[in-house]
Curated annotation (Swiss-Prot):
It comes from Petunia hybrida. This is Glycerol-3-phosphate acyltransferase RAM2. Induction: Regulated by RAM1 during arbuscular mycorrhiza (AM) formation after inoculation with Rhizophagus irregularis. SUPFAM superfamilies: Glycerol-3-phosphate (1)-acyltransferase. The keyword Cytoplasm does not apply. The lineage of its organism: Eukaryota, Viridiplantae, Streptophyta, Embryophyta, Tracheophyta. It is a multi-pass membrane protein. It is found in: Membrane. The gene is RAM2. The chain crosses the membrane at residues 14-34, 37-57, 215-235, 237-257. Keywords: Acyltransferase, Glycoprotein, Membrane, Transferase, Transmembrane, Transmembrane helix. GO terms for biological process: cutin biosynthetic process; glycerolipid metabolic process; response to symbiotic fungus. The keyword Transmembrane applies.
């Protein structure tokens, strides 16, 4: 797989992703410390022995369910960004597709079958005990050399042989000799990975904290940066929470957080004229969207949210009320807040990292005609500030742990009267129009995916949050 189906010839980055996402910084450190031994064994002693070291350093003691979760939610994004274009051209043209790999099957099978249409995946089988990986492998061991050829024979039951075999190293020759035609994929530094828009199934949702594929050097940099980055994140969060909102923009700038503001935001509502507040309709990138909207305006804007951690409630500088998911209750609550002033809502209901907009809930369009779309986008170089599988309380910390995160807030024109519900448009028409307007501004694609679709894909549930009784609505970090 590495070097054949993928451009990169090293599997270390994918082991590092599993190590960090499941075991955290200390497991990643253990893997980095073990990597010189793995490299020495791989290149000078035995390819199989080197892979065994990586498997042990990564998997020993991990819950198998956690490994499967990372393989489903995290790895596909990184695998898909490294596909070899020429290999994919051959692979996709075949009627039946089988992948033989020395990588653990548990890591690669989900991506290969769901996104590349593989019919069969044969990989190294890891050893398990009471739901945890032991760090060792089952017989016949690592699938390299003769083991790979034997696995292919067993899979095809000696009744037929593959028409085409692709490999990239000498240890692939034994299984390639069993194929009617065999081709070597030679290493070429000039080959660029295939564009992801050519995949048969686009990757709309993915999880995990790391933005870049962690090579050994990048993994070491991440380990060294995390203590420094955490202190920097605490300082940035404290500045946002403690300083008056008009000063937050300048404090962020001094601390390396860039906020770019475009468009002409409306002035605050005047209570003396009985003017109701403006409802800002934002695309949803992280739970910090309302914070950066408030930073751009220089005044705190209340927000409504579905779920947020208690830690985020404590450190938030803006006032927000939780949605109950009861249509009548939520509508009355939003109307009441609009009578008090401006309000921000993210009608997607959950975040999306890729250039897609999820389906907009239409409830907001029924409650007011004072609608201002806001296109939110951000850039992070090291860590993602969102998660579906992990603890959301760390989301703001991971975002602010980036060396120089950037948020771009684009205020669009207020929705014309003739496009509102008051002028006869349906709430769904209004919601869809605003979704298309924001998508066009960001060069994103509109979808009909929802919160349930995201959490089903990434976490295996529908994203429903159980409200704790007696928990008063206070401050939250965003939607």
């Amino acid at each position: 797989m590495d070097g054949t189906l993928l451009v990169g010839r090293s599997s270390f980055p994918y082991f590092a992703l599993v190590a960090f996402e499941v075991g955290g910084i200390f497991r990643l450190l253990f893997l980095v410390l073990a990597s010189p031994l793995a490299g020495l064994l791989y290149y000078f002693i035995s390819e199989s022995a080197g892979i065994r070291v990586l498997i042990f350093a990564t998997f020993a003691g991990m819950k198998v369910s956690d490994i499967e979760s990372v393989a489903r939610a995290v790895l596909p994004k990184f695998y898909s960004s490294d596909l070899h274009p020429e290999t994919w051209h051959v692979f996709s043209s075949c009627g039946k597709r089988c992948v033989l790999t020395a990588n653990p099957r548990i890591m690669v099978e989900g991506f290969l079958k769901e996104y590349l249409g593989a019919d069969m995946v044969i990989g190294t089988e890891i050893s398990m005990y009471k739901g945890r990986a032991t760090g060792f492998v089952n017989k016949p061991g690592i699938l390299v050399g003769d083991n790979k050829a034997m696995a292919l024979k067993k899979a095809f039951c000696s009744t037929s042989t593959p028409d085409i075999g692709l490999g990239d190293r000498k240890t692939d020759f034994p299984f390639m000799n069993l194929c009617k035609e065999s081709y070597i994929v030679r290493p070429d530094p000039g080959v660029k990975p295939m564009s992801q828009d050519k995949l048969p199934k686009p990757i709309v949702f993915h999880d995990g904290r790391l933005v870049q594929k962690p090579s050994p050097l990048m993994a070491l940099m991440i380990i060294l940066w995390i203590p420094v980055g955490f202190l920097l994140a605490c300082l940035r969060i404290a500045a946002g929470a403690l300083l008056p909102m008009p000063l937050v923009y300048y404090a962020f700038w001094a601390l390396g957080v860039r906020v770019k503001v475009k468009g002409n935001p409306p002035p605050p509502a005047k209570k003396s004229t009985d003017q109701t507040g403006v409802l800002f309709i934002c695309s949803h990138r992280t739970l910090l969207d309302p914070i950066f909207l408030s930073t751009s305006l220089g005044r705190p804007i209340p927000a409504v949210t579905y779920s947020v951690s208690r830690l985020s409630e404590i450190i938030s500088p803006i006032k927000t009320v939780r949605l109950s998911r009861d249509r009548v209750t939520d509508a009355n609550m939003i109307k009441k807040m609009l009578e008090e002033g401006d309000l921000v809502i993210c009608p997607e209901g959950t975040t999306c990292r890729e250039p897609f907009l999820l389906r907009f809930s239409a409830l907001f369009a029924e409650l007011t005609d004072e609608l201002v779309p806001v296109a939110m986008s951000n850039k992070m170089s090291m860590f993602h500030g969102t998660t579906a599988r992990g603890w959301k309380g760390m989301d703001p910390f991971y975002f602010f742990m980036n060396p120089s995160p950037t948020y771009e807030v684009t205020f669009l024109n207020k929705l014309p009267y003739d496009l509102t519900c008051k002028a006869g448009k349906s709430s769904h028409d209004v919601a869809n129009y605003i979704q298309r307007t924001i998508a066009a501004t960001l060069s994103y694609e509109c979808t009909n995916f929802t919160r349930k679709d995201k959490y089903k894909a990434l976490a295996g549930n529908d994203g429903t949050v159980t409200t704790k009784p007696g928990l008063a609505a206070k401050k939250v970090m965003g939607c």
